[in-house]
Amino acid sequence: MSYNIGIDARKIADFGIGTYIRNLVQALGELDQENQYVLFVGLQNKEILEQLPGNFRVVIERSPSYSARELVFLSWRLFRLRLDLYHSTHYVLPAVVPCKAIVTIHDIIHLLYPEFLPSPLAFFYAQRMIRRSLSRGDRIIADSQNTKTDLMEYFDVDGRKIRVVYPGVAESFRHRVTQEEMNRTLAEFGLERPYLLFVGNPKPHKNLDNVIKAFARALEIHPFEADLVCVGDRSSIEFKIRQRASQLGLSDRLKLLGHVEDKDLPTLYQGATLFLFPTLYEGFGLPVVEAMASRVPVVTSNTSALKEVAEGYAHLVNPLDVEEIAKAIAQCMADEDHRDALIKLGVRRAEDFRWSRTAEQTLDVYNSALRRDSRKGKRQTDPKDKA
């Protein structure tokens, strides 16, 4: 039986959620030719979803994410389109959802670290919307067991409604680039020396200040010839970053590349000597497994989902302890055998994360929600709900 399924893809251009949406949609397109899909996108993002299969179509939705408009206008669209199921790829559901509802909740950092939010209003909005989605959603998808546990503990909800579906790693990170491609890309970005890589947005929980301080301290512990390269839009905090680098004598060692196109990311990963990601909190930590798939040793945090994903496969540190991060960097840079061991472990771990598997499990969640007795209004038993 074919169903009409709507997916909120308005955040498709975003750094984190956008990666999730782009790869999930592509993998669903390769997996499922039976159901009909409607993708809600903003006007400026419709070109991102070119070359979709025939059972996918795009609907322009001008309501901004996290706005009052989306609560009303998306509800109206869902009524008009007569969908069987709607998948919200972030934590907000429209005011009324006249069909089955799936909600992906990537993390609850808004609630665990309210000091990072711009205002108390943002905290109360996130809290209310997540609580509402947990109540009204037929199924909840969490990026990790850590996020599922956070949801259960913070909101005191029944975990049987929440299904853990890990994101995947794009195959482009596993594909080895040629030396010619490597040389060309590094030259385009002006990278002339070996480098350590950090990938992330400018939000405080990414812990970039501690990364810079730890990099400087590592150079004191074990001097090495390498730069610190940071990928991600950080225009809002660039002055503070450069000021910190100047204070530490790193002005010529810090390279801020800003936003980088998806096509260039695998090359930048594969060119790195070491990947640094000691963030304070992650719902999954996709850059970690991207680095692992790229055959780069990883230093990351022993907290949140990062421990779940990387323990035993990366060098874990306390993200609040600059000295510990610095010693990890120094050890990795001094000990080639240690780096090689981390590379082998990381490649093995990255095999656990494929977008084809994410799509299969997401489609299984869809079918679980749709599998109901139409006469009694009760769902059939889904064995995965007991997990």
Region roles according to the model:
Residues 1-387:
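Carbohydrate transferase catalytic cores enriched for Leloir-type hexosyltransferases
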